[in-house]
UniProtKB/Swiss-Prot annotation:
Family recorded in the similarity comment: Belongs to the zinc-containing alcohol dehydrogenase family.
Gene source species: Homo sapiens (Human)
Catalytic activity from the UniProt record: a primary alcohol + NAD(+) = an aldehyde + NADH + H(+); a secondary alcohol + NAD(+) = a ketone + NADH + H(+); butan-1-ol + NAD(+) = butanal + NADH + H(+); 1-propanol + NAD(+) = propanal + NADH + H(+)
Record's keyword terms, sorted: Acetylation, Cytoplasm, Metal-binding, NAD, Oxidoreductase, Phosphoprotein, Zinc
A Pfam match: ADH_zinc_N
Cofactor: Zn(2+)
The name this protein goes by in its record: Alcohol dehydrogenase 1A
Modification sites for N-acetylserine: 2
GO biological process: alcohol metabolic process; retinoic acid metabolic process; retinol metabolic process
């Protein structure tokens, strides 16, 4: 019996309060309006960005259904939808691609003006929610809210992918892999024979290492205080791994000594102000490029000496690794299917969706790289 055009009741993980566990609730998911798509979720990854909301370092309206790194199957579409149809395998896009705004028309950027990151409203693009729980509207997250068995997204925030793709793996292309890999190949534009430093060895940091290796870097130095992650980093391309706690001097000084004055490219993939500055300082003063990849704490500022840039350094950042989402995500899935890269090493745990809080515990303990929740 078709559910198209009807309200669907399903399970979702609702965050009612900051710093509290998720509550598995029955929610009502309204049908898609014009130019919207309702998706049955199959697999979703637990990303550090979701945890930033739980901890309060990233601000979004509450109560909310989080989740933004996922893959599923189209259940129904609203009027006027042309790019996907019921039954299609898809990846929801935390950064949409409307194709019409100034940013979408700029070949150098992917930060579509329809995004819900800069000034989060917690709604779809028409300003309303499709979720109801306990007779209350529930906010969306980044316009996609994938910690729910069903979700509704705008058409410009979903990409059709290869029908043969394994959703429990390619869901990582929705955020973590693309963000890290793209930061190296698109944003920094790592060059063959170069030296790189990657701060933070979670799923995104390891993906950045994969990107540095793919771009031909000769030396990739992985930096983390959790030595348990070093073996995986080396498996994926790191040539050396160092722990800042093993040194009495600042880690940027250690890296500069190791690399004859500084690395060519550095990546901060943690989201801490102190490591962002260390990442900048460790790249060569005359020609180094440092990329901010980790989501910084909300409403906190960095103070720095402009001379650090005047000498020739470049300091930049990007969302989703600089990939234009709707056109690039299907290409990345195609590359995965062609075995141009593997995602297996990033996935350490697979849990049923109902064990979402256990998945976040694994993240907090440093025991997981990526936990995939299966619906």
């Amino acid at each position: 019996m078709s559910t198209a055009g009807k309200v669907i009741k399903c399970k979702a993980a609702v965050l009612w309060e900051l710093k509290k566990p998720f509550s598995i609730e029955e929610v009502e998911v309204a049908p898609p309006k014009a130019h919207e798509v309702r998706i049955k979720m199959v697999a979703v990854g637990i990303c550090g960005t979701d945890d930033h909301v739980v901890s309060g370092t990233m601000v979004t309206p509450l109560p909310v259904i989080l989740g933004h790194e996922a893959a599923g199957i189209v259940e129904s579409v609203g009027e006027g939808v042309t790019t996907v149809k019921p039954g299609d395998k898809v990846i929801p896009l935390a950064i949409p691609q409307c194709g019409k705004c100034r940013i979408c028309k700029n070949p150098e950027s992917n930060y579509c003006l329809k995004n819900d990151v800069s000034n989060p409203q917690g709604t779809l693009q028409d300003g309303t929610s499709r979720f109801t729980c306990r007779r209350k509207p529930i906010h969306h997250f980044l316009g996609i809210s994938t910690f729910s068995q069903y979700t509704v997204v705008d058409e410009n925030a979903v990409a059709k992918i290869d029908a043969a793709s394994p959703l429990e793996k390619v869901c990582l292309i929705g955020c973590g892999f693309s963000t890290g890999y793209g930061s190296a190949v698109n944003v920094a534009k790592v060059t063959p024979g170069s030296t790189c430093a990657v701060f933070g060895l979670g799923g995104v940091g390891l993906s950045a290492i994969m990107g540095c290796k793919a771009a031909g870097a000769a030396r990739i130095i992985a930096v983390d205080i959790n030595k348990d992650k070093f073996a995986k980093a080396k498996e994926l391309g790191a040539t050396e791994c160092i722990n800042p706690q093993d040194y009495k001097k600042p880690i940027q000084e250690v890296l500069k000594e190791m690399t004859d004055g500084g690395v060519d490219f550095s990546f901060e993939v943690i989201g801490r102000l102190d490591t962002m500055m260390a990442s900048l300082l460790c790249c060569h003063e005359a020609c180094g490029t440092s990329v901010i990849v980790g989501v910084p704490p909300d409403s906190q500022n960095l103070s720095m000496n402009p001379m650090l840039l005047l000498t020739g350094r470049t300091w930049k950042g990007a969302i989703l690794g600089g990939f234009k989402s709707k056109e690039c995500v299907p290409k990345l899935v195609a590359d995965f299917m062609a075995k141009k890269f593997s995602l297996d090493a990033l996935i350490t745990h697979v849990l049923p969706f109902e064990k979402i809080n256990e998945g976040f515990d694994l993240l907090h303990s440093g025991k997981s790289i990526r936990t995939i929740l299966m619906f």
